[in-house]
């Protein structure tokens, strides 16, 4: 579009349309003294525009059975809706209005701040959730990627209309956003004035590899919880295309080690065989310029050392010898099946469609992803394991 907005549409015969805006504006884009501002702006975007009240925004789609929602990550903010196809135009108009014309009225801030502060306190009461952010704060210390997305209650209470307008005028621009739509026969006209000038896409503050994981080692925090919560992890791969082979190898390896299947190596070793944990899982997070692989587990405080030894033993196996062809093929089959089932969740598929287009300028292609998984070899898995699971690169955080 002349204004710089990118749009992607995947038609569907379904009577429901999923659509929205993905904006490259997350907590990593916050400047000094702005921690939590991206999430604050997400909340306040629903509180009024130049021509809509908060009540009108709330009721606009719900009156016809639709839904309106949003979320903030470290790299983007997403506003999205689901509506019967007949009301697609209504949803497009509303989403465009709140994203590009919100006024963030001061009279609404006082009420919404209390909602956000309750969200922060609720999050702080959940160590199984909090430890993930605390871990990234250690890993990315000194960089906005290390900030908690929600911010602190003290900081959030200080935000004003001027703060929200300053942040969104810098980042909520057509050239920094993608409009996505899954469903319907054709992409509707998006009501952004032609006078809106296209601007170059914003460049993020890149992280140099030398600055990653300077805090490698063990950190213990006394949380006074009944159960111990443990995170360990190391740097991994960013979204760069020249790391595609490594990223897909780690994607498969992560699913084998601690993916969502009950047959994951760590779940079988720690839970099924020994009954040491209720939850153990691993994950890989891919940012534009860096990445993170980590494992989380919850166990009795007296079992922490034993659990860590068992995790280390499993990681060493992948470093020491390649997977057999039978196990590798079984792992690929499982992951391909999971991806296929994921595609049946239409809302999540729509959100992924927008996310991939925002950051990679291409449509989501599950068939291509499955082919990339099939191309991974046992030697690829072992090479990536030796790189990611190197003990000297590991950071460990323990809540007791």
What are these regions (language model features)?
Residues 54-204, 220, 236, 258, ...:
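Charge-rich, well-structured scaffold segments of protease-associated domains
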């Amino acid at each position: 579009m002349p204004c710089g907005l990118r749009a992607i549409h995947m038609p569907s015969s379904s009577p429901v349309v999923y659509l929205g805006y993905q904006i490259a504006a997350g907590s990593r884009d916050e400047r000094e003294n702005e921690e939590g501002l991206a999430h604050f702006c997400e909340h306040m975007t629903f509180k009024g525009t130049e021509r809509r009240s908060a009540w009108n925004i709330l009721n606009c789609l719900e009156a016809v059975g639709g839904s309106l929602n949003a979320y903030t990550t470290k790299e983007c903010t997403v506003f999205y809706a689901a509506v019967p196809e007949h009301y697609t135009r209504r949803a497009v108009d509303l989403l465009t209005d709140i994203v590009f014309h919100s006024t963030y009225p001061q009279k609404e801030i006082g009420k919404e701040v209390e909602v956000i502060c309750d969200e922060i306190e609720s999050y702080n009461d959940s160590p199984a959730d909090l430890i993930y952010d605390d871990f990234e704060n250690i890993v990315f210390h000194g960089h906005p990627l290390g900030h908690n997305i929600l911010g602190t209650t003290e900081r959030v209470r200080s935000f004003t209309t001027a703060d929200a307008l300053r942040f969104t005028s810098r980042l909520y621009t057509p050239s920094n956003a993608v409009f996505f739509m899954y469903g319907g026969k054709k992409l509707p006209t998006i009501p952004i004035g032609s006078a809106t000038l296209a601007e170059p896409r914003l460049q993020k503050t890149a992280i140099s590899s030398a600055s990653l994981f300077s805090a490698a080692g063990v950190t213990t925090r006394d949380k006074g919880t009944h159960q111990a919560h443990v995170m360990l992890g190391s740097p991994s791969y960013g979204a760069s295309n020249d790391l595609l082979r490594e990223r897909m190898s780690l994607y498969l390896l992560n699913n084998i080690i601690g993916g969502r299947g009950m047959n994951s190596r760590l779940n079988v070793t720690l839970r099924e065989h020994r009954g040491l944990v209720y939850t153990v899982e691993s994950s890989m997070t891919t940012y534009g310029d860096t990445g993170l692989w980590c494992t989380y587990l919850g166990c009795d405080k007296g079992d922490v050392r034993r659990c860590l030894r068992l995790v280390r033993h499993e990681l060493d196996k992948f470093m020491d010898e390649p997977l057999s062809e039978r196990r590798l093929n079984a792992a690929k089959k499982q992951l391909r099946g999971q991806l296929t089932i994921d595609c049946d969740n239409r809302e999540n598929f729509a959100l992924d469609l927008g996310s991939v287009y925002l950051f990679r300028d291409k449509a989501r292609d599950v068939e291509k992803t499955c082919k990339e998984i099939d191309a991974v070899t046992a030697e690829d898995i072992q090479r990536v394991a030796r790189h990611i699971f190197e003990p000297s690169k590991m950071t460990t955080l323990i809540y007791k």
